[in-house]
Amino acid sequence: MSARTSATDEFRAARDFLLAHREDYATAYEGFTWPRPEYFNWALDWFDVIARGNDRAALHIVEEDGTETVVSFAEMSERSSRVANRLRDRGVRADDRILVMLGNQAELWETALAAMKLRTVVIPATPLLGPADLRDRVERGRVRHVIVRAEDAPKFADVPGRYTRTTVGGTVDGWRPYEEAYAAPARFEPNGPTNASDPLMLYFTSGTTARPKLVEHTHVSYPVGHLATMYWIGLKPGDVHLNISSPGWAKHAWSNLFAPWNAEATVFIHNYTRFDAGRLLSEMDRAGVTTFCAPPTVWRMLIQADLTQLRTPPREVVAAGEPLNPEVIEQVRRAWGVDIRDGFGQTETAVQVSNSPGQDVKTGSMGRPGPGFEVVLLDPVSGAPGADEGEIALDLSNRPVGVMTGYHGDPDRTAEAMAGGFYRTGDIGSRDEDGYITYVGRADDVFKASDYKISPFELESALLEHDAVAEAAVVPAPDELRLAVPKAYIVLAAGWEPGPDTAKELFEHSRTVLAPYKRLRRLEFGDLPKTVSGKIRRIQLREATAAGSDAEYREEDFR
């Protein structure tokens, strides 16, 4: 038996164990062991294997104008091999860095597989990036090759560097057309084995306080690690999976590449320039979507449509990233008969904590540790594991496969994140008697008011229960008596007007649902500053709060 065959069998056995116990959390958690092959290339040792003679759709894309692209597993395997051969002819070598900045188009998936086959290191990039961000990525990422949409090529005019340039969907002077790849040979022969520990991806995280960190993943930490994501979503062979996420971010690789194809499911994409809930539901119905993942913002827009128009609702629905309004959860439950299940992970990891199928869902909880992850809460003072509330961390004594190698080129940050034998997430959580973990907030976002610890996440969750609130962010506001008090920046839902009447109602709501020491003391209406990936820039809000604002409402103004 060759090393490649052995690696495939080991991966399949682990995958099949999770599929067999898809709704039996206790058995899955106790019995799962990570496959740890010495050599493994997911594109060659898994995708190409399941693609042989497989005419089922691997990818189904529907554009806004109704045009469709359907690529079978067998076709995707062949196309990616052609692309790999063409890139190799153009000088792409193992360990080279390749920046890929494409939209939700077939070439994105072809390139991802081709890069894996060549053992190059992929730097995913969103088309939203501008020249300054691209200069940083090319320079710090030591990029040797760039593949972008033709319309984005001008962004690189002032991005220095010696890198090959390839455009998709058009010809640009000085760039080679991607489409040349389809004339390359369909058979691909790798130049040697792929060490499982070889680097595969470098993610530039969107920092809210500093330059992005470079998160490094290997040929197993993401492809194999996302068996956990497959388990959380509840994917199984033959499913049609829709995940609403933008290319370039980790969640896209989680749920539009590794998790669904680990399960041998179809990836379904609906491209649009402006979100239309009714149209999305119609396309989901037509495509037969069985599993659905969306961020809370999409869920909140989705319920504005008639959910019952979906004749066959998805079997599994999940969300992650921020709290969902109880109203959203209840409307989906009434219309589709399913609970939206939450999960927790990071760019640095796969899904660590989740409400997997078959578990009782506790409102507000992220769920329990996923198979293969030993999650501990570190005491905020002593750093010892076993706290009822503390920093969410992963025990590295039996290191989970789905954890990054580290922050590339930054040994100090890596050592800090991995200190004491734990991977420290920087997030605070609490654990109940049943092992369910509830998110409290970022360690650096939690603050004290009148000597009480305040979790912005908890206050934001409470505010989102009110119909007027579309989004909320809570930060500490300076106060002479209490040192700090909670202040909320609020984006109002459609139909609500900013002003004293709305402010008064929200203060009253805060007093009703929160303990006295947690209640809201100040608020301000307006947009929330965000990073390009959509994370709230709390440091900017804290700075604005410290500077003071005439647009601020205070609780005492309404007594």
How does the language model describe each region?
Residues 372, 383-416, 454:
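Conserved ATP/PPi-binding loop(s) of AMP-dependent carboxylate-activating enzymes
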Residues 223-240, 247-290, 305:
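Conserved AMP-binding/adenylation subdomain of ANL enzymes
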Residues 55-57, 173, 183-204, 210-211, ...:
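Conserved pre-ATP/AMP-binding loop-to-beta segment of ANL
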Residues 262, 289-293, 303-362, 374, ...:
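Gly/Ser/Thr-rich phosphate-binding loop
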Residues 69-74, 200-224:
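Conserved AMP-binding A3 loop
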Residues 63-66, 151-196:
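ANL superfamily adenylate-forming
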Residues 55-113, 130-135, 219-220:
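Conserved AMP-binding/adenylate-forming core of the ANL superfamily
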Residues 129-130, 146-149, 292, 400, ...:
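AMP-binding/adenylate-forming catalytic core of the ANL superfamily
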